[in-house]
Amino acid sequence: MESKRMEEPYFTFGIIADIQYADMDNRFNYLKTSMRYYRNSLTQLKAAVEEWAMESIKPAFILQLGDIIDGINTKDKSSKTALERVLVEMDKLPIQFHHVWGNHEFYNFSREYLNGSKLNSQARGDRIDRGGGTSENGEFNDESFYAYHFSPCPKFRFLLIDGYDLSPIGREKTSPKYDIALNLLKEKNPNEDLNSPTGLEEVQFVLFNGGISPSQLDWMERVLTSSDEKEENVFVVSHLPVHPDAADPMCLVWNYPEVLSVLQSHPCVVGYLAGHNHEGRYCMDPYGIHHLTFSGVIETPPESRAFGTMYVYEDKMVLKGRGLVEDRTLYYRDPKNKAERH
């Protein structure tokens, strides 16, 4: 009996990415390389919700890794209707969702709208030292970033970061960050179509990606330093991947080397979870951080699935994947060697 208790996880959580629902017929993606199943993505979500509800160990929460509806909804002004249809399905699960914002959130809605919507899950995070989407008086502040952290269990923390903090699509044109982002993008990408990586040395500098501002990097440093001191295990969560071996290089955060430098300098970081690259990829970097990019629901054939449940233990996390998401056992870096990070 004791051994059985020892095998039980501290907690579990669900993960799903790139639902990109729209009430539209199937069509190829932007690059014409893969089919997108717009209506079926809602069916895929329903299947995930049903399975999570039936699990013997109920997930403590669900991570929704961004791009909840597709930008194509703007063509017939159905963005709000599409979002409501997705949220209705999520609400059938009596478990909290933590939402990340991706490029398709910003194709459909302004940052101010998202801040006041159900996709703003900041209230479910710790209220101490949040990144914040509001100013000190509670009003919306377009210069802030959407980021927060929470601890579902002692010694474990999740840090959600804003990959479109610096982005022309993630900021209003009146925002100073808009000008900074657009100037940087045009400096790195001379193409007329800013979504095209043709001829670029740094192919991540396309319009559908974004960057992390110095202020957000500083905030991440503070949170991770605190977690180091508390000897916590931290999972960093974003829409955009940050490791070249965990995604197509065209899908990375603009300044991913800076972000990686921050993550790798903190022994508390054990994993980085992302979406955006629909085929999904995985790598463990030289510092022992697991970079897991999840397959996108939108490009998952009707006969398959694309979601998972992570089981969190003292020394490892075990992913039970469905369909395109593979099962994985991911051990944390040896605590004795954590101090070797620099």
UniProtKB/Swiss-Prot annotation:
Keywords per UniProt: Hydrolase, Metal-binding, Zinc
Alphabetical list of InterPro entries matching this protein: Calcineurin-like_PHP_ApaH, Metallo-depent_PP-like, MPP_ADPRM
UniProt keyword Zinc, yes or no: yes
Binding positions (Zn(2+) 1): 18, 20, 67, 278
Catalysed reaction, written as an equation: CDP-choline + H2O = phosphocholine + CMP + 2 H(+); ADP-D-ribose + H2O = D-ribose 5-phosphate + AMP + 2 H(+); CDP-glycerol + H2O = sn-glycerol 3-phosphate + CMP + 2 H(+)
Enzyme Commission number(s) of this protein: 3.6.1.13, 3.6.1.16, 3.6.1.53
The protein's required cofactors: Mg(2+)
Binding site residues for Zn(2+) 2: 67, 103, 239, 276
Single GO MF annotation: CDP-glycerol diphosphatase activity
Domain of life: Eukaryota
One Pfam family this sequence matches: Metallophos
Task performed by this protein: Hydrolyzes ADP-ribose, IDP-ribose, CDP-glycerol, CDP-choline and CDP-ethanolamine, but not other non-reducing ADP-sugars or CDP-glucose.
Family label: Belongs to the ADPRibase-Mn family.
Subunit structure: Monomer.
Name of this chain's protein: Manganese-dependent ADP-ribose/CDP-alcohol diphosphatase
Source organism of this protein record: Xenopus tropicalis
